[in-house]
Amino acid sequence: MREYYAQRAQTLEKVYQKPERQQDLREIQGKVLDVLKDQRVLEVACGTAYWTERFAPVAASVVATDYCQPMLDVAQAKIYPEGKVQFALADLHDLPAATAGQYTACFAGFFWSHVMRDDQTSLLGHLSKVTGKGTTLVLIDNNYVEGSSTVIARTDLEGNTFQLRKQEDGSRVEILKNFPTDSALRKKFGPVVRDIRIFRNTYYWMLTCVLK
């Protein structure tokens, strides 16, 4: 996965240019900004900082992390409100526990779909540790839309779905990409968070909750 995204760093944001998705993209962006306004945000898997760039002006502060240096190189070349955004090369699993009040929100865009179903519960527990209990978690991701989404190549025994994607060098690679239903999200999140809210339009979904 790291090599896949390293190759895509310069072209990753093309996925946001699909004409049929623009209205839904604006809608989901507005909702993200509403939730993250005045928050001290930890962003995991920030990638090229497409979303960082958009919510940083309304957030109180942002610490944006990713484990892929080519992605961070693109991210750090952008312009942000002075003094608001810090970047760190870090794997989510290596992030230190938050100090009291360090963060009030955690944001992850198009990350949850790349987490194996068997790993999701432990990941939520880890997020609570690195951001602090009572932190608002905000996730956004893709819906599967026939004719717009890359087709699903296979499904494993645990229900994880995979796509075949073309690399910049012309090779093809299998990528985990899950498309959870509302009921699946509530079942997974329910035992470890509170105040779950889910929004969907045609192309995207958004989940907010409070980490226990």
Predicted regions mapped to residue ranges:
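A short glycine-rich, Lys/Arg-flanked "PGG" loop and its adjoining helix->strand segment in the class I
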Residues: 121-133
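A conserved beta-strand element that flanks and buttresses the S-adenosyl-L-methionine
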Residues: 107
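C-terminal alpha-helical "lid/dimerization" subdomain adjacent to the S-adenosyl-L-methionine
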Residues: 140-189
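Short conserved loop adjoining the S-adenosyl-L-methionine
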Residues: 94-100
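Conserved Class I S-adenosyl-L-methionine
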Residues: 48, 174-212
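Class I SAM-dependent methyltransferase SAM/SAH-binding core
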Residues: 46-94
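Conserved class I S-adenosyl-L-methionine
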Residues: 1-37, 39-47
